[in-house]
């Protein structure tokens, strides 16, 4: 009897452990779930929430890192700092690294997005779904378009971030509970990769570098504060944690007079020194080398075995880190020229694509930045830096940085009027 009891406990522990990193190999069967919308988070997750000094209904934030195929759930602790509570291996994402530009390009969005209860879709044909909110105000101001870009189940993607059904059941539950607790919007941060010095140096030759440098400012702000940055858009670019004296943000118009809270400036300055040293070291490591970013087909080939015996719609994609490779710059240039010629010969209409493969170029809507320094130089975007660690930043810096008072949300489609009595976020910084 005792042996049976222990066996049951062991099996239960195995299933519960599948809630996070192990779902790639231990895929739970959720066909028995009748009420998926209200299906509760597992006891093991609730125990971890309590252990980390969080409340079940406290706010959450979602982070996505395309290259390694990771989706993270961060949750507010009782001290208003956020800590990672869960991590999932994304089952499928389409396209390559880089932002979504237009309908049909198969690209999954990159940027900062605002999710509300209206973005939850309990009736999705892909089990459950959360709309990413693409296009946001930045995307619209830059002429980018696309519809129905989701985080959903079923492990099949055409511009979405697709999870297993078991994973989306849990992710949906995190969002549902946070909204029940009063959170108005959940910030989604979608990055091409963890924006460390190592990764920025490795991707320094990408045509998307200027866009990524801009995203990195928001990444750095979170790494320092462990709070979702307050995001706005002006002059067709993102700005983060900026205080204004009565000016309003307009995505396509000139930025209002604004400034960064002094405490945040100090913290970011210290952070940047660490980053610069790490970047200099990484540049020496990658001198004369270039990173080849694999195609979707090349990533799918890595996990072809997983599709055997499964329904045709099941279409996992492998890691871009595993499918990509480091090459000598001369070899990389030759490979890009060969691919460009193949594209040109297959369709004259794709000449522009071929050209972009031959010569990486900065985004037309972003200011050019020196290749030697991956951090954006524009002061209005709170240029900052990332520590040398290759994983998520947990270096203790946040403990010394004051927390913004207001709930720092990503932007919505139309910026709401701010209530006069609402406490400005920078006042909290001055308090400590």
Model segments located where?
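Short Gly/aromatic-enriched secondary-structure transition segments
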Residues: 78-79, 83-91
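Proline-rich, low-complexity linker regions of envelope-associated factors in Gram-negative bacteria
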Residues: 227-432
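Post-signal peptide N-terminal segment of mature Sec-exported envelope proteins
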Residues: 25-52
């Amino acid at each position: 009897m005792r042996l049976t009891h222990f066996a049951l406990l062991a099996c239960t522990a195995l299933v519960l452990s599948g809630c996070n990193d192990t779902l790639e190999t231990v895929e739970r069967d959720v066909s028995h779930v009748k009420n998926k919308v209200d299906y509760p988070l597992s006891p093991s997750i609730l125990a971890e929430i309590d252990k980390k000094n969080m409340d079940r209904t406290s706010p959450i934030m979602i982070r996505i890192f395309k290259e390694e195929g990771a989706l993270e759930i961060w949750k507010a602790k009782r001290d208003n700092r956020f800590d990672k509570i869960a991590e999932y291996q994304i089952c499928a994402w389409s396209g390559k690294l880089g932002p979504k530009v237009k309908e049909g390009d198969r690209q999954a969005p990159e940027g900062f997005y605002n999710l509300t209860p209206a973005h939850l879709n309990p009736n999705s044909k892909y089990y459950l779904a959360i709309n990413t909110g693409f296009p946001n105000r930045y995307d619209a101001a830059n002429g980018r378009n696309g519809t129905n870009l989701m985080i959903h189940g079923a492990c099949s993607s055409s511009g979405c971030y697709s999870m297993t059904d078991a994973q989306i059941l849990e992710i949906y539950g995190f969002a549902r509970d946070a909204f029940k607790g009063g959170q108005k919007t959940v910030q989604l941060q979608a990055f091409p990769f963890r924006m460390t010095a190592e990764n920025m140096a490795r991707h320094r030759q990408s045509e998307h570098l200027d866009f990524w440098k801009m995203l990195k400012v928001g990444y750095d702000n979170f790494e320092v504060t462990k709070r979702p940055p307050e995001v706005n858009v002006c002059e067709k670019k993102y700005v983060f944690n900026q205080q204004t004296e009565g000016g309003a943000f307009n995505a396509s118009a000139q930025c209002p007079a604004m400034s960064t809270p002094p405490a945040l400036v100090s913290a970011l300055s210290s952070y940047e020194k660490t980053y610069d040293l790490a970047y200099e070291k990484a540049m020496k490591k990658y001198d004369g080398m270039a990173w080849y970013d694999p195609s979707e087909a090349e990533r799918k080939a890595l996990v072809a075995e997983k599709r055997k015996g499964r329904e045709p719609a099941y279409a996992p994609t492998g890691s871009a880190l595993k499918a990509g490779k480091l090459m000598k710059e001369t070899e990389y240039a030759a490979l890009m020229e060969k691919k460009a010629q193949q594209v040109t010969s297959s369709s004259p209409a794709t000449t522009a694509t071929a050209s972009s493969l031959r010569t990486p170029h900065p985004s037309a809507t972003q200011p050019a930045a020196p290749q030697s320094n991956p951090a954006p130089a524009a002061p209005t975007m709170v240029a900052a830096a990332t520590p040398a660690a290759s994983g998520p930043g947990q270096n203790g810096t946040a403990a010394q940085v004051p927390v913004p008072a207001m709930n720092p949300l990503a932007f919505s489609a139309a910026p709401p009027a701010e209530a006069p009595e609402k406490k400005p976020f920078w006042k909290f910084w001055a308090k400590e």
